[in-house]
C-alpha cells in the first residue's frame, strides 16, 4: 500500500510529490528563484488539492505545516517587493544626513550625455561589414600611403581594424605604417606604433628598424631625432642584433642629416667591420654628410668622391647631383689644405701619417678588407677629411718641385692675402680661366701649370674646379649617365650669372632631350631678378608659354625680387589679379624686402594697403621686416634740423601702428597636424620627438 500511495503522489496533471520535493529543495536553499507565482502554486498544490489522500496522522500534520509555511512565504515575498518598489519610504535611512548636493535637470542631462559619450568611446559599435584579414589591411594601408594619405591609413588601422573588427595586427601592419610616417618625418607617431608593437609581443623585422631610422632622418627636429636614433642603436647593440646593409644606410642617413661627418664615418667603419659590401649608395650618404659642413663641405665632398672612384665604384646621377649641391652650398675651406689634398695624387694622400698620439692605435687596427675597402683606408680618409692647417707640415713632403716652378718657366711672383692663396702662375704667360682646364672629378694628374688654388668664393668658381658646365656634363657622359631636369636645375643655380654658360642651358635641354619644368625656369628668373634684370626675367615668360608650362606662385615671387620701383611692384600685383592668382604672404614679403633696400617708405605703405585690401594674414617674417623698417638709423639725429627722411619714417610709423592692429595674424601650422586625427592641442605637443619605451 505504501508503494501505491507514493505512486499517487507522482501521478495526475500536477504531481504533488514533485511539488513537495521542489518545496523541500527550495526551503533548504537561500534564495527563491521561482518568481511571484511560485509560493502560490506550491500552496495550491498542497492545500487546494481536490483528491484526498489516505495518509496517516503524522503525514497530515506534515502536510498542514507545509501549507502554513507556503502561505507565510506567499505573504512575505509580495510585502518585501512592495517595500522595494515603493517610493518615498527611504527617508528613515537617510534621516541622519546633514549635507545635500544641489542638482538640476540640466546637470543630470549633462551627466547622462557624458556617460553616453564615454560608453561610445569605450565600447565602439560592432563591425557589421565584411570581415577582412590582416593582409587586406596591409595592402590597403600601403595603397593609401603611396597616394599620400597617411592620415586615412592610420585611421583605417586604428579605428576600423583594431576597434571595430578587433583584429590582432601583424608585424607587417605596423611596419608599413612606420614606413609611411618615415616619409613625412612623423617621428612621434612612428615610435608610438613601435612601442605598441612591442606591447603586443610582435618581433620587429629589419624593415621595421630601417623605417624607424628613416623617420629619424626625415624629422623636422634634428636634435631630438638624433637622440632617438642613438638610443635605438644602443638597444640593438645591447641585443647584439645584426643589421643588414639597408638598415645601415638608414642609420647613415640619420648621421648625415642630423649629425656630422664624424658620426657618418663611425657608421661607415661599422659597416665594414660587419662585412657588408660598400656600394655607391653608401658614398652618397657620405656626400650628404659633407654638405652639412658649410665651410669646408665642398673640399670634403671632392675627397669622398675621389676615394669612391679609386675603389672602382661607378658613380650615379644622384651622386653628381650631390656634388652640385655641395658646390652651391659649401665652401672650399683653407686653400692651402685643399691644394695639398686635392692637387696631389691619390697614392700620396692615402698614406698620410696619423696625428700624434695615435701611432700605436693605428698599428692595432686589423686590416679587414671588404670588396677593396679596409679600415686602413677609412682611417686614412678620416685623417684627410679633418686635416687641420696646423698639421699641414707633418704630412708627406711638400709638393713636387715641378709643380712650383718649371725649368722652362721664368721666375714666378707670389702674393698672399689673409684667408686665401692665389695661384702660382708665371706673370708673363698667365693662362685665362677658359684656357686652363681643371677637373677634380677624375683621378688623373692635373696639369703641372696648376700649383695651388686661388680665390674660390662663389658657386661658379667651385663649378670651374669640376670642369665647368661642359666639363661636368662630359664626365657624366664618360660614366654613361645623362642629366635629368634636377641636374640641369642645379647647374642653373651654380653657373655664373649672365655668362654664356647660363644662356646655353636652354640649348643643353634640347640637346639631351630633357623636358623642362616650372622649377627650372623659376631658377633662371630668380637669378636674373637678383641681378636687377627684371626685363630679362620677364622675357622668359613667353618661353614658358611656348613649352606649355603654367607659372606658379613661386614664379611671381621670383619676379618680385627685381621689383625695386613702386610701379613695377604695383604692376606685378595688378597682373596677378588679372591672371586670377591671389598674392600670398611670400610675395608681399619679397616686395617689402625690395622696398626696404631702397628705403622707399611710400612704396612700403602702398604694399601694406594692398595687403590689407586682400586680407592676407601677417606672419612673423613680415613683422620682423616692418619692425626693422620702423626703426630710426643708429646715427640719425632728429634735433639737427628738418629732414625729409624723418617725415617719411614718421609717417610710415604712424600708418604701420594702425595697420598692424587691423591685420589678422597667420598661425604657423604644426608639421604633423595634417596626419593627426585629433587636433594638435588635444595631444601632448611638448614631446616633439616621441621616444622609445624601455624594455
From Swiss-Prot:
PPR repeat spans: 133-169, 170-204, 205-243, 244-278, 279-315, 316-352, 470-485, 517-551, 552-583, 584-618
Name of the protein described by the UniProt record: Pentatricopeptide repeat-containing protein 1, mitochondrial
MF terms (GO), sorted A to Z: tRNA binding
Compartments where located: Mitochondrion; Mitochondrion matrix
Renumbered residue ranges of the record's region Disordered: 391-416, 672-695
Comp. bias intervals (Basic and acidic residues): 685-695
Transmembrane regions: none
Keywords tagged on the record: Mitochondrion, Repeat, tRNA processing
UniProt cross-references to InterPro entries, sorted A to Z: Pentatricopeptide_rpt, TPR-like_helical_dom_sf
Principal localisation: mitochondrion
One GO CC term on file: mitochondrial matrix
PROSITE patterns: PPR
Quaternary structure and partners: Associates with mitochondrial leucine tRNAs. Interacts with ELAC2.
PANTHER family: 2-OXOGLUTARATE AND IRON-DEPENDENT OXYGENASE DOMAIN-CONTAINING PROTEIN 2, PENTATRICOPEPTIDE REPEAT-CONTAINING PROTEIN 1, MITOCHONDRIAL
Function summary: Mitochondrial protein implicated in negative regulation of leucine tRNA levels, as well as negative regulation of mitochondria-encoded proteins and COX activity. Also affects the 3'-processing of mitochondrial tRNAs.
A Gene Ontology biological process term: tRNA 3'-end processing
Family of this protein: Belongs to the PTCD1 family.
Gene3D superfamilies in UniProt: Tetratricopeptide repeat domain
Amino acid at each position: 500500500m505504501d508503494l501505491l500511495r507514493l505512486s499517487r503522489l507522482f501521478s495526475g496533471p500536477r504531481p504533488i510529490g514533485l511539488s513537495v520535493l521542489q518545496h523541500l529543495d527550495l526551503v533548504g536553499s537561500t534564495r527563491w528563484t521561482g518568481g511571484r507565482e511560485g509560493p502560490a502554486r506550491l500552496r495550491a498544490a498542497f492545500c487546494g488539492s481536490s483528491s484526498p489522500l489516505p495518509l496517516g496522522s503524522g503525514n497530515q500534520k506534515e502536510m498542514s505545516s507545509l501549507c502554513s509555511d507556503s502561505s507565510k512565504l506567499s505573504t512575505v515575498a509580495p510585502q518585501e517587493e512592495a517595500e522595494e518598489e515603493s517610493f518615498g519610504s527611504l527617508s528613515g535611512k537617510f534621516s541622519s544626513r546633514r549635507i545635500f548636493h544641489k542638482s538640476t535637470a540640466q546637470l543630470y542631462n549633462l551627466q547622462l550625455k557624458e556617460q553616453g559619450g564615454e560608453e561610445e568611446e569605450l565600447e565602439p559599435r560592432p563591425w557589421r561589414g565584411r570581415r577582412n584579414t590582416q593582409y587586406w589591411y596591409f595592402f590597403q594601408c600601403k595603397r593609401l600611403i603611396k597616394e599620400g594619405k597617411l592620415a586615412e591609413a592610420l585611421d583605417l588601422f586604428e579605428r576600423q581594424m583594431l576597434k571595430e573588427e578587433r583584429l590582432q595586427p601583424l608585424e607587417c601592419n605596423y611596419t608599413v605604417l612606420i614606413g609611411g610616417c618615415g616619409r613625412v618625418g612623423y617621428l612621434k607617431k612612428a615610435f608610438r606604433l613601435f612601442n605598441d608593437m612591442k606591447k603586443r609581443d610582435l618581433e620587429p623585422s629589419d624593415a621595421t628598424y630601417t623605417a624607424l631610422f628613416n623617420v629619424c632622418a626625415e624629422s623636422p627636429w634634428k636634435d631630438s631625432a638624433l637622440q632617438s636614433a642613438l638610443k635605438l642603436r644602443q638597444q640593438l647593440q645591447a641585443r647584439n642584433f645584426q643589421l643588414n646593409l639597408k638598415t645601415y644606410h638608414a642609420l647613415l642617413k640619420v648621421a648625415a642629416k642630423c649629425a656630422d661627418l664624424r658620426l657618418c664615418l663611425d657608421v661607415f667603419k661599422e659597416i665594414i667591420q660587419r662585412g657588408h659590401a660598400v656600394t655607391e649608395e653608401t658614398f652618397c650618404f657620405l656626400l650628404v654628410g659633407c654638405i652639412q659642413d658649410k665651410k669646408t663641405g665642398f673640399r670634403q665632398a671632392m675627397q669622398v668622391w675621389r676615394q669612391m672612384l679609386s675603389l672602382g665604384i661607378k658613380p650615379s646621377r644622384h651622386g653628381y647631383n650631390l656634388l652640385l649641391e655641395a658646390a652651391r652650398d659649401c665652401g672650399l675651406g683653407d686653400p692651402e689644405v685643399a691644394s695639398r689634398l686635392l692637387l696631389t695624387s691619390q697614392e700620396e694622400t692615402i698614406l698620410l701619417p696619423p696625428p700624434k698620439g695615435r701611432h700605436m692605435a693605428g698599428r692595432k687596427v686589423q686590416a679587414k678588407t671588404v670588396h677593396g675597402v679596409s679600415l686602413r683606408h677609412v682611417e686614412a680618409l678620416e685623417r684627410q677629411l679633418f686635416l687641420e692647417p696646423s698639421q699641414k707640415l707633418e704630412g708627406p713632403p711638400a709638393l713636387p718641385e715641378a709643380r712650383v716652378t718649371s725649368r722652362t718657366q721664368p721666375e714666378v711672383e707670389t702674393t698672399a692675402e689673409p684667408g686665401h692663396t692665389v695661384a702660382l702662375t708665371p706673370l708673363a704667360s698667365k693662362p685665362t680661366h677658359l684656357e686652363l682646364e681643371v677637373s677634380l672629378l677624375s683621378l688623373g694628374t692635373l696639369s703641372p701649370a696648376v700649383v695651388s688654388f686661388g680665390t674660390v668664393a662663389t658657386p661658379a668658381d667651385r663649378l670651374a674646379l669640376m670642369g665647368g658646365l661642359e666639363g661636368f656634363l662630359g664626365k657624366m657622359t664618360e660614366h654613361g649617365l645623362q642629366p635629368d631636369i634636377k641636374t640641369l636645375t642645379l647647374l642653373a643655380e651654380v653657373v655664373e650669372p649672365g655668362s654664356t654658360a647660363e644662356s646655353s642651358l636652354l640649348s643643353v635641354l634640347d640637346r639631351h632631350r630633357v623636358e623642362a619644368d616650372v622649377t627650372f625656369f623659376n631658377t633662371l628668373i630668380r637669378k636674373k631678378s637678383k641681378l636687377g634684370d627684371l626685363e630679362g626675367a620677364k622675357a622668359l615668360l613667353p618661353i614658358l608659354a611656348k613649352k606649355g608650362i603654367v607659372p606658379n606662385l613661386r614664379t611671381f615671387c621670383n619676379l618680385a625680387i627685381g621689383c625695386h620701383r613702386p610701379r613695377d611692384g604695383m604692376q606685378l600685383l595688378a597682373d596677378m589679379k588679372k591672371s586670377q592668382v591671389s598674392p600670398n604672404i611670400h610675395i608681399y614679403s619679397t616686395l617689402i624686402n625690395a622696398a626696404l633696400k631702397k628705403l622707399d617708405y611710400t612704396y612700403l605703405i602702398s604694399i601694406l594697403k594692398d595687403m590689407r585690401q586682400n586680407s592676407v594674414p601677417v606672419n612673423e617674417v613680415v613683422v620682423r621686416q616692418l619692425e626693422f623698417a620702423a626703426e630710426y638709423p643708429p646715427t640719425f639725429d632728429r634735433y639737427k634740423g628738418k629732414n625729409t627722411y624723418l617725415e617719411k619714417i614718421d609717417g610710415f610709423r604712424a600708418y604701420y601702428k594702425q595697420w598692424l592692429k587691423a591685420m589678422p595674424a597667420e598661425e604657423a601650422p604644426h608639421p604633423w597636424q595634417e596626419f593627426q586625427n585629433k587636433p594638435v592641442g588635444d595631444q601632448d605637443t611638448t614631446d616633439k620627438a616621441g621616444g622609445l619605451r624601455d624594455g
